[in-house]
């Protein structure tokens, strides 16, 4: 019986039975100018409230732009000045999910949007991205 437990532990460790960190974002959005959209990022495989969550924009014509950050512990936010009044971040601890609402959309808002977990002084895990297309 003892060897069975040891072997199971070794196999479980080697095959990654332990939870893996994942950031799962909501699907693509195609919306008309002037409306708002709310996208989400669900964390799993770690203690959700131990890490702040950032949002980053990658438009077709520009490099990465930092939108802002939300504390998953208390909901405090900080935004890039450019996105104040445009982006609103919220957290739902019960579902380990952060949301970002973007208001008064224009074609300039079309982009790939990424959530990223902050660890120490770098982003250690990224969501797969949510494509936002604003078109009439």
From Swiss-Prot:
GO terms for molecular function: antigen binding. InterPro entries: Ig-like_dom (IPR007110), Ig-like_dom_sf (IPR036179), Ig-like_fold (IPR013783), Ig_sub (IPR003599), Ig_V-set (IPR013106), IgHV (IPR050199). Gene3D superfamilies: Immunoglobulins. GO terms for cellular component: extracellular region; immunoglobulin complex. It holds the Pfam family V-set. Residues 1-19 form the signal peptide. Coiled coil: none annotated. This is Ig heavy chain V region BCL1. It comes from Mus musculus.
